[in-house]
Amino acid sequence: MGSMNAMDADLLTVVRGCYGAVRIRDLELTRTQRRHVASLVRTGELIAHEHGVVSLPGAERAVVLARIHGGLLSCQAAMRYYDLPFAEGSEQVHLVVSDSGRFAAVGREVIHVDRSQGSASPTCFPVQALPEALARFLRCHLQDDSPLIALDAALHDERVTAEQIRNLLRGPGSARALARLDRASDRARSPLETLARMDLHAAGLSFEDGVEIEGVGEVDLVVEGWVVVELDGYTYHCDEY
């Protein structure tokens, strides 16, 4: 019994090391280990999912879906992983997979096909690299606000460059994404500044952002060449972003 418990504990540790969810075949288990996995499912220590995936109870649903499809998280789910801001609202998990005929959606997840996209190692978090995820977000999202907020933050923090993103914008939605990229700014210091720029652009008003004024310092926006707009107070700007 002690030996069986030790094997069970080892298997649970392995699944935990795969961010809580893994496709069984990716573990290359022995027949005995597979029997122990089945036993762990029966006792509720593991949960069985579609297409041979098991997870720990409470595993992140987005990770479970990524393992089911053998894909990588992208768009808003990737922004959450990279701790980039976006407009809050209903969130669907978007995944990038390399094979369009692999598996149908098992819920409300959105599947993007990119034949050049590889799959993550079971021990790696299943997410696209940040430049690729941002490029996909710019192409995919229906509204301008979320992708621009995330992109502005990534540019401001020097985590990506505009040129990196531009070079990745190919395929459906790229024209819209390029237009969004042209409106991005590495000088925005908060989502509120991004949203204000969007409103000014929609109103047809000219503006500059992140303007240095002698004797004052940097201000958020100068509208129509003379109206100074300061959006965020000290409480917001004293944090890291």
Give, region by region, the residue ranges found by the protein language model.
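Short gly/ser-rich loop at a beta-strand->alpha-helix junction or flexible surface loop bordering the NTP-binding
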Residues: 1-173, 209
